[in-house]
Structure formats: C-alpha cells, structure tokens
C-alpha cells in the first residue's frame, strides 16, 4: 500500500531560510465498513416502529416475578437477546459455549429439578445439531424447557449455514412439543410468560434485535394455541404466521386500494394448530392463501391443508395457494433483495394475489 507524506516548512532562526520539517506519514483514512446483511440485520421496513430486544426484556421481567426462570446460551447471548437477561440476572444465566447438545441436556436437568429454563441459540443449531437431545432429553419426558431459536427462516443473509428454512418441518412431528412463530414484538412479549407457564417443552422462532411493532394497532392478545382474525374480508383470506403476518397486513391494505377485500388470520402457534380458526378462515368461497417465512414443505401450508382435509367440516375445500420459501437451499445476500427474490416481500405478495385473481 502506498504511504503518502506531508511536507511543510518552518523558518531557520539562524539563516532565515526555510527548511523542510521532518517528513511525517499522513494519518491513514478511516476505513469505511461495508454495509452487509449480517446476522444482526433487522427485518423492519424503513420507518417502521420497532421495539429493541423484546424477548430479552420480557424474560428479564418474568424472572423478577418467578425465581425458577433461568437462561442458557450457546455462545450467542448477544445475538439472541439473552444478554439482556444475563445482565439483569447474572447468577441465573449459564453460558454453555458452542455446545448446543450440551446446552439442551443441561436445560433438561435443570427442568427436572423444578427450574424453568429458556435455552437460546440459532434455529439451525437447535434443530439440526441438537435434535436428538431435544427429542429424548426434553420432549420424551415432557419437560418444561423453552428452546429459543433465532434467525428463523429467511431472517439472515448468511446463507444455508444460518438460514433455518426447514425448522418447522423438522420439529412438527415431535410429540409433546409446542411451536410458536410470533409476528412482532407484541407477540414475543406476551408469549414469554405463557411459554414459561406451559406444561411441556416449547420452541420459539425468535425475531431479535429491533423487532417491528405491529399488532398493537389491532384488538389482539397472544393466546398460546389460538389463532386470531385481525382483519375481515370477502374476496381473499390470508392465513399467516411469523413475520409474514405483518407482510399480510400490509399487502391487504394495498390490495384494498384495488378493490380487493382481504381477511387476515394470524397463526402464532403452529403446533397445536387452532383447527377451528383455520376452518373459519376457509369459509365463504374465498381464495385462501397461506403465508410463511419457511419452506413450503412441512410448514404452515401443509398444516393448513391437512387441517382442512382431515379436521374441518367444510362441505367443499377452498381454492388454496401458498406463499413461502422454495424447496431449495437459498442464496446469501441482503435481506430486502432476498425477500423480493423468494417472494416474501409485500410487493411480491400483492403481485401474486393479483395474478391468482386475474
């Protein structure tokens, strides 16, 4: 790298002539950090209201009321918002290192003694790497261990090593396990105490960092095991979960301007599924569209289709379409670009519905 120097002169007090000062290296220019879709990237739209670390603050607040609550992390406390809990309750936080299986085994032991553990890591590590421990140490004895998986679906641009696009498909078949996919900060804050009070293991698909705040504008309260109709509509019925509920609501408003009346039913609990709410959302001869931040294989779309076929009393099945990630490993890149590419953006949802109704 070429190094530049500066030159200046000062008068010589003896001769009156100007002599060069000692040459000094120029101060190096400050490096400009490139903008990346790092693991801490936010899913919030520009200008959208957000709440910082809702999970960490909700867990810390719960621990003030319930001395049984403990937190564990597999060396990712900062990136799962568990650092908020650790700072508030340092003697009830356990840093387990990069050992997800060990973390879940330890959490199971804590639950056996009557504690209520929340164990956090990335979703890919909780589901792919530690599945056997979750199954046999936690789910089989039906222990109240709450597994918190950050970066669910396409919420990071780091590629297949960190994108948990199939976590629901992996876990839906596990007996005793309750699965929650929250939409926003409101969902997360209200879900935490209900997960702690639940009799049995849970898996929370965590949105972390600056999480959008959306559901406070609706007459909504999180209820474990229940879905909620957020908006009525006669033409199209959206059945959505996770962050795709905020996209569903935004798309519904856009479609309304085109004269398309869209209902939105939010399904925060994937398992057990609220079959009655699913059946109601499919009534009226409307186009039914499922929306999920997950592969279209083994997630909400499959759960809804199965519910309508085997659990509902509908005389005829509705026309059903699905919006979700493709059955493939995804690219790395900036989140807005990836959401457009794979059909999760509001623009993509609006376009898909318009084409289906054409």
Q: What are these regions, as identified by a protein language model?
A:
Residues 2-205, 210-211, ...:
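Thiamine diphosphate
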């Amino acid at each position: 790298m070429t190094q530049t120097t500066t030159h200046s002169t000062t008068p010589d007090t003896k001769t009156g002539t100007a002599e060069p000062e000692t040459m000094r290296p120029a101060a190096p220019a400050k490096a400009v950090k490139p903008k990346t879709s790092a693991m801490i990237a936010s899913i919030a739209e520009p200008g959208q209201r957000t709440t910082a670390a809702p999970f960490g603050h909700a867990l810390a607040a719960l621990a003030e009321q319930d001395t049984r609550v403990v937190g564990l992390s597999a060396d990712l406390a900062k990136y799962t918002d568990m650092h908020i809990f650790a700072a508030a309750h340092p003697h009830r936080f356990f840093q387990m290192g990069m050992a997800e299986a060990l973390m879940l085994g330890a959490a199971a032991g804590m639950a056996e003694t009557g504690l209520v553990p929340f164990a956090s890591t990335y979703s890919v590590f909780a589901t792919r790497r530690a599945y056997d421990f979750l199954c046999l140490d936690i789910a089989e004895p039906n222990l109240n261990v709450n597994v918190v998986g950050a970066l669910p679906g396409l919420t990071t641009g780091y590629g297949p090593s960190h994108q948990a696009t199939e976590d629901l498909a992996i876990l839906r078949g596990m007996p005793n396990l309750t699965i929650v996919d929250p939409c926003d900060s409101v969902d997360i804050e209200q879900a935490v105490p209900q997960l702690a009070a639940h009799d049995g293991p849970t898996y929370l698909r965590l949105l972390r960092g600056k999480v959008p705040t959306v559901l406070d504008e609706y007459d909504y309260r999180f209820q474990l095991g229940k879905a909620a109709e957020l908006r009525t509509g006669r033409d199209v019925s959206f059945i959505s979960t996770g962050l795709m509920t905020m996209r569903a609501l935004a798309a519904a408003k856009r479609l309304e301007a085109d004269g398309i009346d869209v209902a939105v039913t939010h399904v925060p609990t994937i398992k057990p599924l609220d079959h009655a709410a699913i059946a109601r959302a499919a009534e009226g001869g409307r186009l039914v569209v499922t929306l999920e931040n997950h592969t279209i294989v083994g997630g909400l779309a499959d759960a809804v289709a199965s519910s309508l076929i085997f659990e509902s009393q509908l005389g005829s099945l509705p026309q059903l379409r699905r919006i979700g990630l493709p059955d493939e490993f995804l690219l790395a890149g900036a989140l807005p670009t990836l959401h457009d590419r794979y059909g999760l953006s509001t623009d993509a949802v609006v376009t898909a519905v318009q084409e289906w109704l054409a």
